[in-house]
């Protein structure tokens, strides 16, 4: 029985193309949905995911674990950042009733 090595079929170029597509989708989402703050946060998360795909792809290609470890650290920090951002948005929505970027821009102390 032959064990398949996926590195023979899926090369570094495939991961880089996937990463660039995910980053482009995140960038387009950031530019096209500038009114809703939740869509902006999701687009930023997509862009961070694309960077993590790059780290993992180069880590596998170079046969080092540092890129994968760094990717896990970035995912942990991004999850904490997103949860804090969504908690702030939830409190703001309860007080003001809207989460549009134009309304948040006009916040005053």
UniProtKB/Swiss-Prot annotation:
It is an enzyme of class 7 (translocase). Keywords: Cell inner membrane, Cell membrane, Membrane, NAD, Quinone, Translocase, Transmembrane, Transmembrane helix, Transport. InterPro entries: NADH_UbQ_OxRdtase_chain4L/K, NUOK/Mnh_C1-like. The chain crosses the membrane at residues 12-32, 40-60, 72-92. One of its GO terms (molecular function) is NADH:ubiquinone reductase (non-electrogenic) activity. It comes from the Bacteria. It is a multi-pass membrane protein. Its EC number is 7.1.1.-. GO terms for cellular component: NADH dehydrogenase complex; plasma membrane. It catalyses: a quinone + NADH + 5 H(+)(in) = a quinol + NAD(+) + 4 H(+)(out). Pfam families: Oxidored_q2. The keyword NAD applies. Signal peptide: none annotated. GO terms for biological process: ATP synthesis coupled electron transport. It is found in: Cell inner membrane. NCBIfam families: PRK05715.1-2 (NF004320), PRK05715.1-3 (NF004321), PRK05715.1-5 (NF004323). NDH-1 shuttles electrons from NADH, via FMN and iron-sulfur (Fe-S) centers, to quinones in the respiratory chain. The immediate electron acceptor for the enzyme in this species is believed to be ubiquinone. Couples the redox reaction to proton translocation (for every two electrons transferred, four hydrogen ions are translocated across the cytoplasmic membrane), and thus conserves the redox energy in a proton gradient. Belongs to the complex I subunit 4L family. HAMAP family: NDH1_NuoK (MF_01456). NDH-1 is composed of 14 different subunits. Subunits NuoA, H, J, K, L, M, N constitute the membrane sector of the complex. This is NADH-quinone oxidoreductase subunit K. It comes from Rickettsia bellii (strain RML369-C).
């Amino acid at each position: 029985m032959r064990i398949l090595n996926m590195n023979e079929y899926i090369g570094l170029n495939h991961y880089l193309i996937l990463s660039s597509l995910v980053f482009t989708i995140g960038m387009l989402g950031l530019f096209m949905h500038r009114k809703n703050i939740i869509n902006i946060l999701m687009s930023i998360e997509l862009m961070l995911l694309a960077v993590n795909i790059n780290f993992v792809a180069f880590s596998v290609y170079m046969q080092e674990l540092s890129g994968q470890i760094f990717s896990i650290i970035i995912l942990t920090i991004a999850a904490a950042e997103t949860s804090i951002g969504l908690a702030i948005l939830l409190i703001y929505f309860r007080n003001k009733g809207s989460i549009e970027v134009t309304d948040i821009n006009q916040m005053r102390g």
